[in-house]
């Protein structure tokens, strides 16, 4: 279904199951289907909400840069919750979705029953080359997403055996990745990739978080492992789950271990 948020952008939202609300928020360049392997299972006990961020998938794609920021994406989450009549919820954010989730938790802690930060960070990522980010943003805006994809495809493959295994062994996974990229807005890409590069470091502020928190990361997702450990150390009572044989998308790369970590946290936190 479509939910129109407060600035007029329509977001494609899918709700499955009943019970306590659980929002699963995808990352940069992702889609609501990034959690498709787990929705049926989780929806047995939870009201699972997934949606495409603006500029992604089946959601609206504003053409102005002012419509894209990490804070705006956070506002979208709250707008969707309000439209569904959900006062409080567990919030899981993956990658950029985790950056957004941490900001929602910091600014609206009363809305968050539990927080799951997945393969994400507390601030700028040291491994990210700011000049390359700017080059990619300019290419997206001036030459288009097709040209950008050709350049990205010609680059060095990700050093992630788990991801390569998915591409080789999971039927349709490569096509799934291609479809997601094909839906992306150039303005979104350029604006949000800069926002990710320039984000604030919220580690000290995260020490004030009081909701139950799980920090989850694939063991070979090297840009995010150290920041995940730092967040788990900073947030009072936080649990750290390092998923073996997984990189940036452990919900696909080691689905069973990911599901155990998430469901164990939900049960232990009495979010049921």
Give each language-model segment a name.
Residues 26-28, 89, 93-95:
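Conserved alpha/beta-hydrolase "nucleophile elbow" surrounding the catalytic nucleophile
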Residues 126-130, 145-207:
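Conserved alpha/beta-hydrolase catalytic His-Asp/Glu region
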Residues 71-88:
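Conserved acidic catalytic loop of the alpha/beta-hydrolase fold
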Residues 209, 215-217:
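Short beta-strand/loop motif that positions the catalytic acidic residue
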Residues 246-259:
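Catalytic histidine-centered segment of alpha/beta-hydrolase-like enzymes
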């Amino acid at each position: 279904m479509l939910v129109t948020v407060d600035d007029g952008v329509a977001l494609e939202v899918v709700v499955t199951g009943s019970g306590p609300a659980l929002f699963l928020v995808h990352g940069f360049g992702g889609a609501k289907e990034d959690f498709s392997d787990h929705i049926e299972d989780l929806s047995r006990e939870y009201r699972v909400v997934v949606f495409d961020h603006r500029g992604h998938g089946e959601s609206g794609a504003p053409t102005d840069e002012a419509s894209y920021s990490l804070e705006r994406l956070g506002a979208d989450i709250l707008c969707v919750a309000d439209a569904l009549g959900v006062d409080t919820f567990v919030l899981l954010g993956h990658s950029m979705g985790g950056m957004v989730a941490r900001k929602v938790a910091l600014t609206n802690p009363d809305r968050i029953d539990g927080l799951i930060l997945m393969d994400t960070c507390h601030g700028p990522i040291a491994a990210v080359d700011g000049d390359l980010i700017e080059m990619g943003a300019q290419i997206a805006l001036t030459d288009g997403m097709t040209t950008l994809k050709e350049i990205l495809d010609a680059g060095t493959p990700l050093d992630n055996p788990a991801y390569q295994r998915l591409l080789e062994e999971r039927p349709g996974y490569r096509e799934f990745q291609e479809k997601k990229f094909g839906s992306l807005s150039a303005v979104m890409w350029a604006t949000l990739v800069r926002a990710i590069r320039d984000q604030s470091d919220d580690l000290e502020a995260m020490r004030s978080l009081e909701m139950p928190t799980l920090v989850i990361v694939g063991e070979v997702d090297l840009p995010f492992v150290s920041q995940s450990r730092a967040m788990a150390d900073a947030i009072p009572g936080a649990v750290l789950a390092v998923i073996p044989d997984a990189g940036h998308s452990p919900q696909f790369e080691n689905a069973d271990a990911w599901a155990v970590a998430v469901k164990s946290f939900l049960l232990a936190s009495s979010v049921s």
